[in-house]
């Protein structure tokens, strides 16, 4: 009993030290747990495809039989996927890449001049906008220099008065429409005509009219013949 009491007495003063040590251990354990949690998070962020690499490998083996060259490690597979991402990623073309100038500018630049020698230094070509501004400034200065023409003099009082109405003269050179029609009627029948005395609708008379038209008019009327009555004044 004495020995046990002595042992207990000896252990009692050591208790606060052990408690401090236990606290230290707990603090160290907490720091270690935090470090482990950080490591776990870090490992998860880096190896997010650790479980799905096998499925990716099986898919590549099915669709791309020759793709087993980069299947030795996850790093090679990851680099291969990154290369595919960069290779097949869409490239957005800007108007500057296609046309050589930005689309926000309404003025199209002039085409480049002929290539100069290699030894000579290339001078910066002035832009079309600067050229047009200079031309506009020159034109405005020239307009300012030109004197304005004097205003026209006011018209005399005689011209400002309204003109008197003119009496209408005889129309068509003093002739009426009936006189003009009578004068023009004989000229309408001056072309050669063919008179058909017999029945027009008979085949024989129509054939005779065609023959006579060939002799007089020198026209072949066999393809189409159109006959109508035309009043001809008797001589």
From Swiss-Prot:
Domain of life: Eukaryota
UniProt entry keywords in alphabetical sequence: Phosphoprotein
Sequence positions bearing Phosphoserine: 52, 89, 198
Modified residues (Phosphothreonine): 185
The keyword Glycoprotein belongs to this UniProt entry's keyword annotation: no
Biased composition annotated in UniProt, kind: Pro residues: 149-159
UniProt keyword Phosphoprotein present: yes
Record field: compositional bias (Basic residues): 1-13, 120-148
Alphabetical list of Pfam families matching this protein: CCDC71L
Chain residue ranges for the region called Disordered: 1-30, 109-167
Cited PANTHER family: COILED-COIL DOMAIN-CONTAINING PROTEIN 71, COILED-COIL DOMAIN-CONTAINING PROTEIN 71L
Name under which the protein is recorded: Coiled-coil domain-containing protein 71L
Organism: Homo sapiens (Human)
Name of the gene this protein is made from: CCDC71L
């Amino acid at each position: 009993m004495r020995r046990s009491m002595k042992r207990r007495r000896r252990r009692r003063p050591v208790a606060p030290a052990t408690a401090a040590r236990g606290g230290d251990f707990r603090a160290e354990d907490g720091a270690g747990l935090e470090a482990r949690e950080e490591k776990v998070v870090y490992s998860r962020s880096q190896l997010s495809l650790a479980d799905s690499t096998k499925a990716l490998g099986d898919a590549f083996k099915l669709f791309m039989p020759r793709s087993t060259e980069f299947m030795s490690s996850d790093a090679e597979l990851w680099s291969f996927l990154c290369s595919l991402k960069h290779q097949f990623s869409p490239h957005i073309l800007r108007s500057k890449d296609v046309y050589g100038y930005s689309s926000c500018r309404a003025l199209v630049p002039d085409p480049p001049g002929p290539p100069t020698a290699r030894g000579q230094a290339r001078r910066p070509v002035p832009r079309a906008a600067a050229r047009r501004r200079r031309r506009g400034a020159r034109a405005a200065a020239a307009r300012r220099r030109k004197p304005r023409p004097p205003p026209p003099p006011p018209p005399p009082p005689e011209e400002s008065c309204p003109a008197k109405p003119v009496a209408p003269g005889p129309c068509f050179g003093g002739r009426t429409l009936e006189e003009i029609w009578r004068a023009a009627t004989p000229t309408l029948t001056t072309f050669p005509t063919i008179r058909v005395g017999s029945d027009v609708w008979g085949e024989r008379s129509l054939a005779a009219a065609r023959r006579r038209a060939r002799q007089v008019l020198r026209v072949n009327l066999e393809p189409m013949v159109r006959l109508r009555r035309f009043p001809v004044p008797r001589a």
